[in-house]
Swiss-Prot record:
This is Beta-toxin Ct1a. Gene3D superfamilies: Knottin, scorpion toxin-like (3.30.30.10). SMART domains: Knot1. Pfam families: Toxin_3. Disulfide bonds join C31-C84, C35-C60, C44-C65, C48-C67. One of its GO terms (cellular component) is extracellular region. The modification Asparagine amide is found at N85. GO terms for molecular function: sodium channel inhibitor activity; toxin activity. InterPro entries: LCN-type_CS_alpha_beta_dom, Scorpion_toxin-like, Scorpion_toxin-like_sf, Scorpion_toxinL, Scorpion_toxinL/defensin. Residues 1-19 form the signal peptide. SUPFAM superfamilies: Scorpion toxin-like.
């Protein structure tokens, strides 16, 4: 019984510690922010922090800016019912 309680508590804690992640999106076009220097990228870090706050992180992944440590309601790519100019 104690082990079941511990497992449940650990799963609840993991759920609250993990933050949302996703591609930075341009709300007017529905497109991801593009980047070309993969990995650590000052441009992506700056754009993610500007849109999502100082606590956000960002780097270039698959030629798009990937933002980390976002709040749960953060809007990331893809936008519902909005395509990236047919791409």
């Amino acid at each position: 019984m104690n082990s079941l309680l511990m497992i449940t508590a650990c799963l609840a804690l993991i759920g609250t510690v993990w933050a949302k992640e996703g591609y930075l999106v341009n709300h007017s076009t529905g497109c991801k922010y593009e980047c070309f220097k993969l990995g650590d990228n000052d441009y992506c870090l700056r754009e993610c922090r500007q849109q999502y706050g100082k606590g956000a992180g960002g780097y270039c992944y698959a030629f798009g800016c990937w933002c980390t440590h976002l709040y749960e309601q953060a809007v990331v790519w893809p936008l519902p019912k909005k395509t990236c100019n047919g791409k």
